[in-house]
Amino acid sequence: MFPRDARLDMYDPELAKAIAAEVRRQEDHVELIASENYCSTLVMQVQGSQLTNKYAEGYSGKRYYGGCEYVDIAEQLAIERAKKLFGADYANVQPHSGSQANQAVYFALLQPGDTILGMSLAHGGHLTHGANVNVSGKLFNAVQYGVNAQGLIDYEAVESLALEHRPKMVVAGFSAYSQKIDWARFRAIADQVGAYLLVDMAHVAGLVAAGVYPSPLPHAHVVTSTTHKTLRGPRGGIIVAQAPQEALVKKLQSIVFPGIQGGPLMHVIAAKAVAFKEALEPAFKVYQQQVVKNAKAMAGTLMLRGYKIVSGGTENHLMLVDMIGRDVSGKDAEGALGQVHITVNKNAVPDDPRSPFVTSGLRLGTPAVTTRGYQEQDCVDLAHWIADVLDAPADVTVIAAVREKVAAQCKKYPVYR
């Protein structure tokens, strides 16, 4: 019925052309978006397998459909590997995304109208931590904390807000914060007011797995994550916990299915299993150590060139460049760097006077370039080229020269050999 040698370029040339162009873009452009990475060919192979055909509502051994004996194996492998990777006693690998993992925890442990205390999006948090444009800020009474003048989380202010508002849940985690978080301090604050502590470690999950960033699992009631970003797996979500009470496990299991999702994506769950196996390899720790080394090299070079990094540096995979007071906006910078084939994203910075669609900042991250094989000197060079462009975004001579250097660097480090 379906020939294995069918060619997409023959059947749907328009789509095939777009995919081929994206493949070329990934090879020919430097990827510095902190939330992006390249997954392995094995992960892609599994995600494109016949497992996509199988419906498997429920959990391993307790399905609502027959014929699930083999996908049960795949899901159980993902669960056991996730538990081993993070030192967890519980893992749910069915969430379709990190946002849905967060949503599941909210719905499992909260009632509409309950108060949550999360990090402000404008100060480095995530949409799902209570932003008013997100369901987390619409269904719940969201109180937001931020960073101090040094760009660091103000734990005293977090504690004061918790004592004032008595949240049912404290949310820790970020999408644009470059320092280590004191998970124990967050748990102490949550305990003071009898709140749950949810940690969203989506950005640093790979670093946590490799032991190069503090693990939140000993401190949080529940931890969520994406499975891509620094974990380098397929796009998806996960919920893990260490020594959870049985009542909590039951709530989480029942809210993921049937509470907010139906059939799990078995091809994605199997791909998660592959990614977790890869993350358990010794080489993964070496990779994550290099991610941080590269980020430090890049941030240090940008600061030497006169660019401000929020919080004064980085202890993880990302950095936030603060361009308040400069003529070039985040939007302008993103466009100028795009011309030289360096892909970044504009990002709001604390106390940003510009709109979220323009911004005064850039978020940069090193997971993807480190996957390509970049070392510290490569990232020093890259940071100088970024500064060259930001110093003269309209100078066609600079743009042409940097684009040529980027092309040579990309050729030196292909993604898929």
Swiss-Prot record:
Highest taxon above the source species: Bacteria
Positions carrying N6-(pyridoxal phosphate)lysine: K229
Keyword Disulfide bond attached: no
UniProt pathway: One-carbon metabolism; tetrahydrofolate interconversion; Amino-acid biosynthesis; glycine biosynthesis; glycine from L-serine: step 1/1
This protein's GO CC annotations: cytosol
Site (Plays an important role in substrate specificity): H228
Pfam families on file: SHMT (PF00464)
Subcellular localization: Cytoplasm
Binding of (6S)-5,6,7,8-tetrahydrofolate, residues: L121, G125, H126, L127, S355, P356, F357
Cofactor(s), names only, from the UniProt record: pyridoxal 5'-phosphate
Keywords for the protein's UniProt record, in alphabetical order: Amino-acid biosynthesis, Cytoplasm, One-carbon metabolism, Pyridoxal phosphate, Transferase
GO biological process, one term: glycine biosynthetic process from serine
Assigned protein family: Belongs to the SHMT family.
Protein name according to UniProt: Serine hydroxymethyltransferase
